[in-house]
C-alpha cells in the first residue's frame, strides 16, 4: 500500500510549497512551530499525509495520548502532513508541509515527498529550517540559505553556489539533492538561532521564520501579538543574561565580534579566559528561567 495518502487531490495554480521538518533542521523547534502557525494563519486545510508506520521507530518517537474536544481518548502518531491554502489574490496557491525527520527508509520517504511535489505540480519548493549559531540574541534573526534557481536566489537574496559544508546531513539536504537532480526549482532557508539560548519555544525565532515564509509567498506580515511575544522574550533573555557572568561575558564577546564581522560565525567563540561550552551556557540559562517560573518564594 502506498504510504502517501491524499484526502483531496487539489487543483492548484502554480503552488509554492513551504516545508518544515522537526529534528536535525529545527533548532529550538522554531521551524515546525512557524509551519504550524502558518497553517492556522492561512486557514490551510489538510490535503495529504504520509503514513508513519514504515518510517519511525516508535520506541524513539512515541505516539502521544490525549483527549479530544469530545472527551474521547485518542492516540496521535508522528505526522508528516500537507496543507493547502488557496490564494485568489495571488498568482499562485500555497502548500505547507509540517513534519518530522524520519528514522528509517530515507530514500523511500524522499521518493514520497517527490511524488507529492510532482502530483501537485509544485512550482517552487522552499524548506524553512533553523540551525544553532554563535549569534547575538538581541540582533535581528539572521538567515542563510541558497537556491539553484537564479531568479529565486536574486529575489530572496540567497547564495546561488550553495553551501560548501561537508559531513552528516539531514532530510532537508537529502530532499534538496533529489530536487536538484530532477532540476526542480527550490531553495533552502535557515534561521540562525543563538546556541546558548535553548529555551523552547523561542517566540523571536518563530516570528522571524513566519515573516520569511510570508515574504516568500508574497503575503503581508501583520503579526502584532507575535511581535509582542518576541519583545517580551528578548526582555526575559536580557534579564537572564544579566544574572550570569559567564553568559554575560560571552554576549559581550559576541557584541565585539559583531562590530568586526558582517556574517555570524557558526562555531563557538573563545571567551576571555577559556571557551565556554554551549551546553554550559544553555544549562545556566535554563536554570535561571526555571527559577523565574517558580517565583522568589520557591527559590
Language-model regions, residue ranges each:
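Conserved active-site and cofactor/substrate-binding residues in soluble primary-metabolism enzymes
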Residues: 26-33, 104, 108, 112, ...
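A conserved C-terminal secondary-structure "cap"
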Residues: 197-299
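Catalytic cores of processing enzymes, dominated by hydrolases/peptidases
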Residues: 134-216, 220
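Internal, conserved structured core segments that host functional sites
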Residues: 92, 100-152, 175
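Flexible, glycine/proline-enriched loop segments at strand-loop-helix junctions
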Residues: 21-25, 97-106, 158-166, 196-200
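Short beta-strand segments
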Residues: 19-20, 98-99, 127-129, 190-192
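N-terminal short beta-loop-beta anion/metal-coordinating cradle
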Residues: 1-99
